[in-house]
A protein has these predicted regions:
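Hydrophobic alpha-helical segments, chiefly the membrane-spanning helices
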Residues: 376-380
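Conserved small/polar residues in nucleotide/adenosyl-binding loops
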Residues: 363-368
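Internal helix-loop-helix
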Residues: 49-145
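Gly/Pro-rich turn-and-neighbor structural signature
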Residues: 117-181
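FAD-binding core of flavoproteins
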Residues: 152-297
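Short, surface-exposed, low-complexity cationic segments
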Residues: 32-50, 193-202
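Extended amphipathic alpha-helical segments enriched in small hydrophobics
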Residues: 294-352
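N-terminal-proximal low-complexity accessory segments that begin disordered
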Residues: 2-45
Length: 380
């Protein structure tokens, strides 16, 4: 694939793909034009548009190709990189008012950078080298990588190998000289249809009996054996009704889907964990550390919510009423708490053994993961 430079390039890259997608029980022929799916594509495309308009914020120089790439593809080489990721995330939240779907992939490969290195250190494998080779390939074309961690899980009191249905967690069902075959499902996968590649990862701490579930690998989203079940959200169908009013966020939307894997092949060159169950928890913990901090994007969405609430108050002539002003102030306090703790976490990051930087876990815990935007006063 030719390198993606612009929003238009990105939209062109999504054309003529062979994907099996079901939405409300029907097969989707063209996700690019479907009224429910299209706004989510526009939100993802905004990550490229921002890099065009503000390259110093939304792009970086690849350490592997020495060429500009989207910042969502960049490995954090210092605390400033972590900080700029947050600045970009808040800006995109302001621009789209929704999820722009690239944070999971960014946080996944930043976590994998150090975890693959430490697996190699213990087991003398070559995962880190293969991972860097894969990442270089992604940088050369400036692609979107999605992260797939959340399994369906089933009975939460039992580990994967004790589930009544073994497909409730993604697992290796066959190995050969060329790679592995996986089956199972990943739930609530953000922006998966709008990505070019996905990286599958375990979702929890594993034991030796769960070795087949300790798999990390990259694969194109068009891989044979994958089916996507699109997860519709409240009021989605309004976009399919005539007219332009009362559709909520008119231009942008988030996207989640269940991804079903039926004997899907992952070649050896794209496998970055294969049975090293004792590193599953490390990967989940490091991914979670990055991802909690990434909820700074919600501060950008919160800015939109606060602005909308203030505008509604003004339209109704109550913008100066004390109880309205009090609620708007409270919304701002909660929103800036999200931002402040995320930024504090990024600026106090530390270098890992592999040389990239991970943010401070302490400041992620009370921050965006608290999802303060969900507690903003609804009566404002």
């Amino acid at each position: 694939m030719e390198k993606i430079h612009t929003k238009a390039d990105y939209l062109d890259s999504l054309k003529n793909r062979n994907l099996t997608i079901y939405l409300m029980g029907e097969l989707v022929e063209d996700p690019l034009t479907h009224p429910i799916i299209k706004p989510s594509i526009e939100a993802m495309a905004e990550t490229y548009a921002l890099a065009e308009r503000e390259p110093e914020l939304a792009s970086a120089i690849s350490p592997y190709t020495n060429e500009p790439i989207n910042r969502f593809l960049h490995i954090a080489e210092n605390n400033q990189d972590l900080y700029l990721q947050n600045q970009m995330q808040r800006k995109l939240g302001q621009l789209t008012g929704t999820c722009f779907q690239r944070c999971v992939g960014m946080d996944a490969f930043n976590a994998l950078h150090s975890v693959t290195y430490e697996i190699d250190e213990k087991y003398k494998t070559d995962y880190h080298k293969k991972f860097i080779s894969f990442l270089t390939k992604m940088h050369e074309s400036n692609l979107v990588i999605g992260g797939a961690m959340t399994d369906v899980k089933g009975d939460r009191s039992k580990p994967p190998h004790q589930q009544a249905d073994q497909d409730l967690y993604l697992r290796v069902v066959k190995r050969d000289k060329k790679g592995v075959y996986v089956s199972g499902a990943k739930a609530h996968q953000t922006g998966c249809l709008n990505s070019h590649w996905m990286v599958v990862m375990p979702t929890l701490r594993l034991t030796e009996e769960d070795k087949d579930y300790a798999i990390v690998g990259a694969l194109p989203i068009e891989s044979d054996g994958i089916t996507y079940i699109y997860g519709r959200q409240s009021c989605d169908t309004r976009s399919m009704e005539p007219g332009e009013y009362d559709v909520g966020n008119k231009y942008f939307a988030g996207q989640e889907a269940m991804v079903i894997f039926d004997n899907v092949f992952i070649p050896n060159e794209y496998i970055f964990m294969n049975g090293e169950y004792d590193f599953a928890a490390m990967l989940v913990e490091r991914f979670t550390c990055y991802h909690r901090r990434s909820y700074v994007c919600k501060a950008g969405v919160g800015d939109v919510m606060i602005g909308a609430a203030a505008t509604i108050a003004e339209y109704n002539g109550v913008e100066n009423k004390s109880h309205i002003r009090e609620k708007l102030v409270e919304m701002n306090k909660l929103n800036e708490t999200i931002y402040a703790t995320g930024i504090a976490s990024s600026l106090q990051g530390k270098e890992t053994k592999s040389g990239n930087f991970i943010n401070c876990l302490l400041y992620t815990s009370p921050s965006p993961r608290d999802d303060a935007t969900s507690r903003m006063p609804s009566s404002a």
